[in-house]
């Protein structure tokens, strides 16, 4: 799952992991017996300390077959949240808020494509 959290100024939350290059949308795996909705809420809290208010809205689902056979990535948008404490320390090196039209150069390719689909109206690619 990946979270597209958008603040009141229209900026998108991105995270820089300690073990991956570049900026990513917050997210991760779905735990056993966990829904994708619950997973994205949990990941957002763990990685960024944001507590979703209301249900996240499913935007798209993408195959991640070339990197992980059988894997899919569900992308959710979250526009209402409270700021709390991060519960995952050591995994996230940096958190940043960026305008979708002024993203850093090193945003992950899949994340950049999802943001273009959401904010620029680019066609949705079925692959991550």
Per-segment meaning from a language model:
Residues 7-10, 78-84, 100-102:
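Short loop segments at secondary-structure junctions
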Residues 7, 11-47:
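Conserved Nudix-box catalytic region and its N-terminal flanking loop in Nudix hydrolases
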Residues 1-12, 61:
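Conserved N-terminal beta-strand and adjoining loop/helix that marks the start
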Residues 51-60:
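A short coil-to-beta-strand element that immediately follows conserved catalytic motifs
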Residues 62-85, 111-122:
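Active-site-adjacent beta-strand/loop module that shapes the phosphate/pyrophosphate-binding cleft
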């Amino acid at each position: 799952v990946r979270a597209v959290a958008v603040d009141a100024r229209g900026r998108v939350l991105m995270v820089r992991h300690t073990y991956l290059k570049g900026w990513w949308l917050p997210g991760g795996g779905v735990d056993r017996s966990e829904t994708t909705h619950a997973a994205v809420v949990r990941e957002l809290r763990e990685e960024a300390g944001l507590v979703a208010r209301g249900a996240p809205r499913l935007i798209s689902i993408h195959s991640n077959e070339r990197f992980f056979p059988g894997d899919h990535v569900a992308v959710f948008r979250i526009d209402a949240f409270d700021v709390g404490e991060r519960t995952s320390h050591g995994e996230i090196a940096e958190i940043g808020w960026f305008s979708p039209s002024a993203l850093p150069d090193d945003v992950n390719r899949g994340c950049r494509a999802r943001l273009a689909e959401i904010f620029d109206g680019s066609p949705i690619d079925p692959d991550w």
